[in-house]
Amino acid sequence: MSATLIDGKAFAARVRAQVAEHVTRLKADHGITPGLAVVLVGQDPASQVYVRSKGKQTTEVGMKSVEHKLDADTSETDLLAVVDQLNKDPDIHGILVQLPLPGHLDEDLVINSIAPEKDVDGFHISNVGLLGTGQKSMVPCTPLGCLMMLRDYHGSLLGMDAVVVGRSNIVGKPMAQLLLGDSCTVTIAHSRTKDLADVVRRADIVVAAVGRPEMVPGDWIKPGATVIDVGINRLDAPEKGEGKTRLVGDVDFDSCAAVAGAITPVPGGVGPMTIACLLANTVTACCRANGLEEPEGLTA
């Protein structure tokens, strides 16, 4: 491997330390404690693990953590009532409804019922529109984490060619908007892009967020390019024992690392940044709600 490893765990720890420092100042100078509420519907094991991790990290940085755990058969009316209650609570500055929701619930309706200024996931249609027009918004956590790591590694992204492989509303599209905002020349590609390999080879920055394990091989990467791997895919790993699995990204790590200038690993790359940026967004939302200066370096 010749590429520099971009350590997401270490970077996320730095972000959490910045958040904790700002929370301490908010308490000492203004008597304000940022509050994050997470709503979980049902018993999805992966969601439960994720919500526990969010709650733990929220309290570790000194913020108020609130969890609402609802039964899987909770009605849409009852779920919307919980969100409405949180919208009106002045001690709650960030609201997150854990996805996916059970099939009988309308995810778009629920997400858009969250007050935009408390939408720390950045999924509300108002925040999507604000981001797309270059205005102040709540920025989706995973793309924000990617941008933070790119800025840290490169300094300025001015004039760089960037390819985002993936067009999801959660990662691909907002990632492209953020890169445009930093004056990159941006191409959004996807699994059906013609001559995808040639498109990717032109990029100084490749962000892979297509949801296909090890789809991007090393011979697609321009020598010296920076590769940000957003993918999290679980593959069978019989070499580890019966029923064992391993996590891989959307790029073939070994072949890409031999060519790239810098690369994020999976696990330990983008993943840890997602919750760190959720905490950062909550502090940002708290400052905006109280007319205070936003913490520097914690948003786009």
Swiss-Prot record:
Q: Which PROSITE patterns does UniProt cross-reference here?
A: THF_DHG_CYH_1, THF_DHG_CYH_2
Matching InterPro entries: Aminoacid_DH-like_N_sf, NAD(P)-bd_dom_sf, THF_DH/CycHdrlase, THF_DH/CycHdrlase_cat_dom, THF_DH/CycHdrlase_CS, THF_DH/CycHdrlase_NAD-bd_dom
Cysteine-cysteine disulfides: none
Q: Tell me the residue numbers annotated for binding NADP(+).
A: 166-168, 191, 232
The keyword Nuclease is assigned to this record: no
Pathway given in the UniProt record: One-carbon metabolism; tetrahydrofolate interconversion
Q: Which UniProt keywords apply?
A: Amino-acid biosynthesis, Histidine biosynthesis, Hydrolase, Methionine biosynthesis, Multifunctional enzyme, NADP, One-carbon metabolism, Oxidoreductase, Purine biosynthesis
A single GO CC term for this protein reads: cytosol
Asked whether the UniProt record includes ATP-binding among its keywords, one would answer no
Annotated catalysed reactions: (6R)-5,10-methylene-5,6,7,8-tetrahydrofolate + NADP(+) = (6R)-5,10-methenyltetrahydrofolate + NADPH; (6R)-5,10-methenyltetrahydrofolate + H2O = (6R)-10-formyltetrahydrofolate + H(+)
**Superkingdom field:** Bacteria
> E.C. number, please?
1.5.1.5, 3.5.4.9
What GO biological process terms are annotated to this protein in UniProt?
A: L-histidine biosynthetic process; methionine biosynthetic process; purine nucleotide biosynthetic process; tetrahydrofolate interconversion
Q: Describe its assembly.
A: Homodimer.
Q: Which PANTHER family match?
A: C-1-TETRAHYDROFOLATE SYNTHASE, CYTOPLASMIC, C-1-TETRAHYDROFOLATE SYNTHASE, CYTOPLASMIC-RELATED
Spell out the family assignment given in the record's similarity comment: Belongs to the tetrahydrofolate dehydrogenase/cyclohydrolase family.
The record's function comment reads: Catalyzes the oxidation of 5,10-methylenetetrahydrofolate to 5,10-methenyltetrahydrofolate and then the hydrolysis of 5,10-methenyltetrahydrofolate to 10-formyltetrahydrofolate.
Q: What is this protein called?
A: Bifunctional protein FolD 1
UniProt organism field: Roseobacter denitrificans (strain ATCC 33942 / OCh 114)
